[in-house]
């Protein structure tokens, strides 16, 4: 008897959760479409277009919010030409990885990698040593 009373509410809860998930995904895609990134050639793409060629095909949460893409975006939209850039860690190390304050680290590969590969097109940059094929004797 109690099960009969709870079942309709559980079904409604499942339906609402599925609707929330669907609406959230749709909103996220609309937000990513608003991130219009410019590269050194003057070409513009949104985050959905940039990440379409990646294995996951969709931008991860937080994509476009890191410092390097924001700094490059400002430079390219302000007629500036970046000469050099480096990222260093400041603050406490996150629990998920070891970071030392003041040390230089590469940009993250999942969020920034695809964005930076697009944005740096048209600049003379050194090859990314992390993307080189490993030497196998």
Segments and roles (model prediction):
Residues 1-137:
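Catalytic cores of nucleic-acid editing and processing enzymes
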């Amino acid at each position: 008897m109690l099960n009969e009373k709870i079942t309709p509410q559980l079904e409604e809860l499942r339906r609402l959760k599925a609707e929330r998930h669907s609406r959230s995904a749709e909103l996220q895609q609309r937000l990513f479409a608003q991130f219009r990134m410019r590269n050194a050639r003057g070409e513009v793409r949104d985050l959905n277009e940039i990440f379409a060629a990646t294995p996951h095909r969709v931008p991860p949460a937080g994509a476009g919010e890191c410092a390097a893409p924001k700094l490059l975006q400002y430079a390219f939209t302000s007629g500036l030409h970046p000469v050099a850039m480096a990222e260093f860690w400041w603050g406490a190390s996150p629990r998920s990885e070891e970071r030392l304050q003041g040390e230089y680290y590469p940009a993250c590969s999942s969020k920034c990698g695809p964005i930076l590969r697009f944005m740096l097109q048209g600049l003379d940059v050194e090859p990314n040593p992390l993307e080189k094929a490993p030497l196998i004797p």
